[in-house]
């Protein structure tokens, strides 16, 4: 949670966090709320009114963080998303593009970060090859990382990546 707190604590605008599963979305959102962040979630099991409430609250600034599955990546229009965090690495480059495309819109500044484990390195490299780019990497201590998986399941470390030209905080 230290790493996420560090990333979120420096953001001025809204942050959109993508997870792969509904359960992961719920777990991350609950942990963020417990840590004192104003957070909401969107995933496929939420009713349309729950999704609308979360999205409207995010757009209006009542929530600093929106945690979502890929359901929100396509067609989501929020003007002031300062940071997109891929909490779970997407398996397809196309999904990666749709996720990170939620930040830095209409000429504004934005940052995209991806969190992955060593096991996912091949998937990240496949995305980089497809997109013909190399992302900057930064190591994190697994004991202070995000609550995505327990420490024993993260192998040795976590890594953050950023799109070229973006700076980690």
Regions found by a protein language model. Give the residues of each.
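Conserved helicase RecA-like core
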Residues: 1-169
